[in-house]
Amino acid sequence: MYNALYGPGNCVDMTKECYASGRNDVCSFADNFCANNVEEVLDIYALRDEYDIRELSPDPFPSTFYVDYLNSPTVQEAIGAYVNFSESNSAVSSAFGSTGDDDRESGTIEALKTLVSDDITVVLYAGDADYNCNWLGGEVVAGEVNAPGFSNAGYTNVTSSDNIVHAQVKQSGKFSFVRIFESGHEVPFYQPLMSLEMFDRAINGKDIATGRRTVKSGYKTTGSAKSTYREGNSTVQFEVVNATATYNTTSNEPDPISAKKSFKAANKRRLFKPAKRVVDLTS
């Protein structure tokens, strides 16, 4: 995997070529190569779910029962929805894939810098069991934004209403990066209380760490330069989780299977990117 990522002409070099050329075919080829040879490695060889490396594939979480809830007439009327909710759309995915969207930076960091300079609250966060959008990469992106004072801020524990530390945050002014503990890709599913309180604090202009301070210029968290917490393997699964299992957000792992449960969760499998193809990089 290291060679696939950093080897000559491989993922990193292809990504740089995508940035330099901006061509759809170059970026799509790079996107496909990186996905099939770096992103999917855990799925292929370790049989782990790249969206939650604690789980073996197929991983039944997050459960898909919420789709029926969101498509109920009562909910749609309450939120003013005019179309049905779909968890994913292959047509949209194909459209993004054809341009190599995943491999493009496309001014994302510059856009974040603009938000920061406009004094807009920005919270970047990631679940630390997510390999696909891993927190280490998120931390690097947060540093690239170069928000005033952020490089000198430190990580501190996030206090939530259940008095359990579910995360650590590094914040300077209205810009913050949050590492969510024991969480896969869809953080609100795995850590619902932490997600809700983080969101509530952000939109109300409060500090992410406690929710008690109104954030003003000069506010900065103090603590270690890196988030070094290690949670061990207590929630790692060594057998494929039953499709009928439910997830316990207190113990941060699947509940034991009850014989009374009869519902069946969908067996989800994220598809590979299209097969690699030869691209002329000289034209």
What residue spans do the PLM features occupy?
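Short mixed-charge
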Residues: 146-173, 223-228, 232
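Generic hydrophobic/packing signal
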Residues: 120, 165-170, 182-183, 268-269
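Accessory cap/linker subdomain of secreted extracellular hydrolases
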Residues: 1-123, 128-136, 143-147, 176, ...
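Short, glycine/charged-enriched secondary-structure capping and boundary segments
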Residues: 137-140, 193
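Extracellular/periplasmic catalytic domains that process cell-envelope and extracellular macromolecules
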Residues: 115-117, 168-172, 189
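Histidine-bearing beta->alpha loop at or near hydrolase active sites
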Residues: 129, 160-164, 181-186
